[in-house]
A protein has these predicted regions:
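Active-site nucleophile and cofactor-binding loops and adjacent substrate-binding regions
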Residues: 26, 50, 78-84, 103-106, ...
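Active-site phosphate-binding/coordination module
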Residues: 45, 53-56, 69-140
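Phosphate/pyrophosphate-binding loops at sites that engage ATP/ADP/AMP, CoA/4′-phosphopantetheine
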Residues: 59-78, 150-154, 199-209, 232-234, ...
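N-terminal phosphate-binding loop and adjacent alpha-helix
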Residues: 32-74
Length: 519
């Protein structure tokens, strides 16, 4: 029997769990996707919850299906790594049992009462103009919500984890998690890549104690090994090494090969993001941290559109169900049909613009944010709306590029595109034209899973370090070149309309918010 020569990556998203097998050159050898249905429960408006065991059971189902399809594959697995959605919180009691459902990253609930910061911190944040930002940070904290609204559950909580930490415990029995998974409302020191120091204000702002949090492990290091129960659930041998990787976006950047500052990773996922990776810590937005990269001693500069390609799902559900049905009948993706329908429409959608700020933010956009469609005339069709959504997301990501370049003084000269939306040729071409840069797909759209696999490959000693592994395991796919005429049109719409559209509409959004929230 030959030595194990494959890596298992588990990618836990909001809507599905994927079990992926890669080789040492980054080729995707096998793939199973198990849907999470429903993706979450909303017992009240703004809430988003899911039973954490649903994710664990889906991992087992996906793995067992892999081995059923290719029985010899399980014996070839040398190690595994995990990547998950960010900022989904799980609380467990002393026995390790979840207390209630996991609070999803999509959740918008706010705690009515939060811990009161010492006067010195309140004064400092007020002087810096950060009082509202810190208040929002506290109110969005799942731990603070539990303390205020479910005190019995809060008192019982022995462990406060992100979904990644919960799943690491399910796999290994250890209370550990990846450094690069710590994106959420936690007392984490992003610059030092560790839990905050004892005197840090975050311990006074969030109702979490240090002993409730897991041990953190750098990417590429071993988190533990499969225990007996996990091995049985996954159909793999006891003792299989489990390596630290990172959150989905961090792994996506690594799995796209965007490991130097001049290369940007654009992720066209539920949340659309633009990231660059660098060794130096730099806050692109003032007082908004750079996140730990999925490799040691590196950080990602990230700008996000919270409701990114979620807008595509929203459009299909609300305005294009007939297209979805037609696509199912033809056994095609609905996005492929929509691509065909928008192809004849000229760049700029005949003057229809979408401002993709569908969800409020903390700083940019602010809590008043609303989405907008501007420029309707009688020539516009549903296809125009769809194209304008893709263009609006591209404009928003270009704005993110310019903020990153301005803050870091590093020009972005290369665009690697990943996420489900990258499978759309129209979305790729629009990005190339709006950015006036060549847009490159990776050889696989499973870039988060590939980023996790790179970490396992480094941990197994197959490659010297993360950048060397990325050079060997990430390969260029299809390339989309900017078209001069489209670039000129998009430049005018971006510079003359889009860049100041939010500022012009902000007072209107504030008035809408005041009226809509009035009793």
């Amino acid at each position: 029997m030959s030595a194990p020569d494959r890596i298992l990556s588990i990618d836990v998203g909001t809507q599905s769990v994927r079990a992926l097998v890669f080789d040492d050159a980054g080729a995707l050898c096998a793939r199973v996707q198990v849907p999470i249905e429903p993706p979450y429960y909303a017992p009240q408006p703004g809430h988003a919850e899911q039973d954490p065991d649903v994710f664990w059971q889906a991992i087992g189902t996906a793995c067992q299906q892999l081995w059923a399809e290719e029985p010899a594959l399980a014996t070839r697995i040398a190690g595994m790594a995990l990547t998950t959605q960010r900022a989904t919180s799980v609380f467990l009691d002393a026995s390790g049992a979840p207390i209630g459902r996991a609070i999803s990253w999509l959740d918008q609930r706010r705690a009515e009462r939060v811990p009161r910061l010492p006067a010195v911190w309140r004064g400092l944040f007020s002087a810096l103009g950060l009082a509202s930002t810190i208040d929002t940070f506290q109110r969005l904290s799942p731990a603070n919500w539990r303390a205020a609204h479910a005190p019995e559950q809060h008192t019982r909580a022995r462990h406060a984890l992100l979904l990644s930490g919960y799943l690491v415990h399910c796999l290994t029995g250890a209370w550990r998690d990846s450094v690069s998974a710590q994106v959420g409302y936690l007392p984490f020191d992003y610059k030092q890549r560790r839990w905050a120091g004892r005197s840090d204000w975050k311990w006074r702002a969030i109702a979490i104690e240090r002993d409730q949090l897991p041990e953190l492990v750098e990417p590429g290091k071993q988190l533990g090994a499969l225990d007996k129960d996990a091995a049985e659930t996954l159909g793999l041998p006891v003792g299989l090494p489990v390596f630290s990787a990172g959150a989905d976006k961090a792994c996506e950047v690594l799995g796209s090969g965007a490991v130097t500052p001049e290369t940007a990773c654009v992720s066209l996922g539920t949340t659309a993001t633009i990231n660059t990776c660098r060794d130096a810590y730099k806050e692109v937005t003032r007082f908004v941290p750079a996140y730990p990269a999925a490799m040691p001693d590196a950080f990602t500069d990230e700008i996000q559109i919270y409701r990114g390609f979620w807008l595509v799902s929203w459009f299909k559900q609300e305005f294009a169900l007939d297209t979805v049905v037609a696509a199912e009948r033809e056994q095609r993706a609905a996005e492929a049909l929509l691509d065909e329908r928008i192809a004849p429409i000229a760049p700029g959608s005949d003057g229809l613009l979408v401002l993709p700020t569908w969800s409020p933010g903390v700083r940019i956009p602010g809590p008043e944010a609303r989405g907008a469609m501007v420029g309707f005339t009688d020539v516009h069709s549903r296809a125009h709306v769809y194209r304008a959504i893709l263009e609006g997301l591209a404009y928003g990501l270009r704005e993110g590029r310019e903020r990153i370049e301005k803050r870091t003084k590093t020009p972005i000269t290369r665009l690697r595109v990943s996420g489900g939306g990258s499978q759309s040729d129209q979305a790729m071409q629009i990005l190339a034209d709006v950015f006036n840069l060549t847009a490159e797909r990776s050889h696989t759209h499973e870039t988060s899973g590939l980023g996790a696999a790179i970490n396992a490959a480094v941990g197994l000693g197959w490659h010297a370090d993360h950048r060397a592994a990325a050079r060997s395991m990430v390969h260029q796919g299809a390339v989309f070149t900017p078209r001069a005429q489209a670039v000129a049109i998009y430049d005018r719409f971006y510079n003359e309309v889009f860049t100041d559209l939010y500022g012009r509409l902000k007072p209107t959004f504030e008035r809408i918010r005041a009226i809509a929230s009035a009793p």
